[in-house]
């Protein structure tokens, strides 16, 4: 994929759907080099549809939103044509709409599948070397290993967010997006 030694990771559509979370995970991958993000056209298409239907974004706005992954991780694209053909995705998830995500994780050699979706069969994916986890769990552990790097990263994300926002607003958004333990650790570290 990109050639880094970092573990490969898939952001499920529910994570890409959250701009604050997918940008945070992207910054962790790109800035701290803790992950090597992989994606597929199928994943981007699913997220685009959800953004148009649920957030009522225009097609163009949704395309720009999901364009973050190919723009920042061009080597992370995984072609799913015939990928993981020997694997029955129905044995990996309860949701047929997530079959392509399972194929992406296996075909790309991903170590992590970041999601809040409980429909994935964790033990079945683990047999393929894929750990299904919420971003919060990964971020908390990674923060403990590199707190200064995370504080710098969060300051940059807050500065870039909508023309610059206070760090407290960014952490509140991260918490609302499902990474409350991580946001709490960062608040303490920032003295908020």
Give residue ranges: language-model regions.
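Acidic, PIN/NYN-like endoribonuclease modules and their adjacent C-terminal/linker elements
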Residues: 118-192
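Metal-dependent nucleic-acid phosphoesterase active-site entry motif
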Residues: 1-25
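PIN/NYN-family metal-dependent endoribonuclease catalytic core
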Residues: 19-54
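Extended, non-globular alpha-helical segments
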Residues: 45, 49-74, 137, 144-161
């Amino acid at each position: 994929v990109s050639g880094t030694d970092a573990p490969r990771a898939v952001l499920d559509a529910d994570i890409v759907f959250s701009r604050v979370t997918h940008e945070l995970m992207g910054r962790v991958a790109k800035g701290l080099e803790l992950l090597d993000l992989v994606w597929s056209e199928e994943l981007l298409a699913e997220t685009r549809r959800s953004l148009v239907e649920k957030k009522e974004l225009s097609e163009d706005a949704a395309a720009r939103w999901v364009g973050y992954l190919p723009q920042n991780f061009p080597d992370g694209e995984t072609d799913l044509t015939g990928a993981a053909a020997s694997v029955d995705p129905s044995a990996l998830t309860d949701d047929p709409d997530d079959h392509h995500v399972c194929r992406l994780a296996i075909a790309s050699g991903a170590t992590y599948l970041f999601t809040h979706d409980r429909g994935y069969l964790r033990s079945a994916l683990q047999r393929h070397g894929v750990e299904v986890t919420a971003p919060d769990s990964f971020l908390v552990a990674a923060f403990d290993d590199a707190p200064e790097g995370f504080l710098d990263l969060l300051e940059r994300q807050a500065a870039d967010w909508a023309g610059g926002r206070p760090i407290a607003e960014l952490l509140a958004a991260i918490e609302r997006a499902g990474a409350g333990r991580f946001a709490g650790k960062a608040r303490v570290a920032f003295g908020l």
